[in-house]
Amino acid sequence: LKVMASRRIVLLGKTGAGKSSVANTILGEEYFTVSHFSPSGTKQCQEKTKCVDGRSITLIETPGFFGTESSEDQMKAAVISCITQCAPGPHVFLILLKVERFTKQEEELIRDICQHFSEEALQYSSVVFTHGDQLPEVEEIGDFVCKNVALNNLVMKCRGRCHVVDNKYWKRGEEGNYRSNQFQVAEILKTIDQIFEANNGGCYTNEMLQNVHREIQKEEIMIMSSSVSLSQEEIRGRAEVKVSDRLLILFAGIGAGMLTGAFLGVLDLLTADSEHNYVGNCQVLTKLFTRYY
């Protein structure tokens, strides 16, 4: 079986949207920790790579960047983890929303995502609705979307791409049945392929993610020269940890909310090659962050 090129998929959504469960549903196994009790859900990025129907999929579940109750230090570590794991950028964003009334809170969530990511990111996005059991029997998700102007506008900006799953009631649906996760996951995978191909295999990126990617590549070369027995996955993992540690030092005086803005493309990361540059770059970043926030 020929394996297609790897796709990096980032799951976005507020706390309680069901990101961990959707990730497990797509991969077909319980890889991601589902938090039913923590008010903030996932505290750190969770990442898993698996071959799904001939395609290598790397799912990166983000913590609730929007509306999280995590501490400043937890949030900062989580954002930096996402930066290093995503670099040089995700091929697809899955924006998760519940099948429920589209309130001002949801509108604000979408407004924040669009504001931080830019309109271009929506070319790499699809909306995935959770709690599909709330969808009336006679409706498909497109019917639900059309009932709300703001929601319909969002889906249209994502070029009409939307799907629905149910992490509780649709687990054992028959093949070909619209109201089954098996059917919906197959459709989601098709959409991921379409986005990947429409962008010629390119990913959403910005200067910050590109700089982080270059730093990871440098670390990989150094690790390979001293540890020839490690697998490529182990080398990448160690390189990410080293770069992540450097970023934690670099952003020691930067607030997590501001750092989130940098990750989402509001600002560019300046490459730090020395201890002197760490200090200088931190001062520059502080000025830039102050300008935007």
Annotated model-derived regions:
Residues I95-K98, V127-H131, V164-D166:
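Conserved beta-strand segments of the P-loop GTPase G domain that flank and frequently precede/overlap
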Residues G67, Q74, Q85, I95-R101, ...:
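Amphipathic alpha-helical interface segments within eukaryotic helical scaffold
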Residues L1-C51, I57-L59, T68-Q74, Q105-Q123, ...:
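C-terminal non-catalytic interaction/localization modules
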